[in-house]
């Protein structure tokens, strides 16, 4: 269900009314206004002696032109037929978005295993609450979710999610698709609560309890 040019909700994970209503309570708009207020307080602290704190919004504003250039340069070829050079170029907006969202800060410990990065707060040795997936750029969300298409940026070997070092599981078969990777992550008892897939102009959010039902949220960056 496309609720706007920028948002697509899979299998009614979030109601259309919640996302589109102008109500300022118990709505998507209310959450946006609340978060904007929090970010403004950090970007422009009341104390004149306090230094501004960067936020995802301030980082996006400063990098917006660069991000637009990178997205405009993405290859228009089918995701499964991209050259190595095209895949490398496609990784640039992915890396920039991670920086904008704050995942490269010292607040987080990143465990990268191929196209899957497990994210946990520094000092937390439990299962990672978030996984970031690098995917090939796609034109539509439907292309991203084809079960057996080579949509990941590279093959992924499933890992032991209970171990903070995430060693590769012996005997596991390599995974090529975003859909299969998400299912592997979300059905593991030690899997992340959320996953964020970055695929060129699209960012897809999946949640552990709802992904098996085919529910997700996609944003056209």
Q: What spans do the regions from the language model cover?
A:
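Nucleic acid-processing catalytic cores of prokaryotic defense/repair systems
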Residues: 1-221
């Amino acid at each position: 269900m496309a609720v706007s040019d920028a948002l697509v909700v899979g299998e009614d994970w979030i109601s259309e009314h919640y996302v589109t209503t102008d109500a300022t309570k118990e709505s998507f708009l209310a959450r946006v206004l609340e978060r904007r207020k929090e970010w403004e307080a950090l970007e422009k602290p009341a104390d004149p002696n306090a230094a501004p704190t960067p936020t995802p919004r301030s980082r996006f504003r400063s990098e917006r032109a660069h991000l637009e250039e990178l997205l405009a340069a993405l290859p228009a070829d089918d995701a499964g037929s991209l050259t190595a050079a095209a895949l490398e170029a496609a990784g640039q907006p992915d890396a920039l978005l991670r920086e904008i969202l704050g995942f490269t800060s010292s607040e987080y410990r990143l465990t990268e295993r191929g196209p899957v990065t497990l994210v946990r707060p520094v000092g937390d040795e439990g299962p990672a609450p978030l996984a970031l997936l690098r995917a090939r750029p796609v034109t539509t969300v439907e292309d991203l979710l084809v079960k057996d298409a080579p949509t990941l940026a590279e093959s992924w070997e499933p890992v032991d999610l209970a171990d903070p070092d995430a060693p590769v599981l012996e005997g596991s078969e390599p995974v090529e698709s975003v859909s299969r990777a998400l299912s592997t992550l979300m059905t593991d008892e030690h899997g992340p609560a959320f996953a964020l897939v970055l695929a060129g102009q699209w960012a897809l959010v999946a949640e552990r309890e709802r992904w098996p039902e085919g529910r997700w949220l996609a944003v056209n960056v």
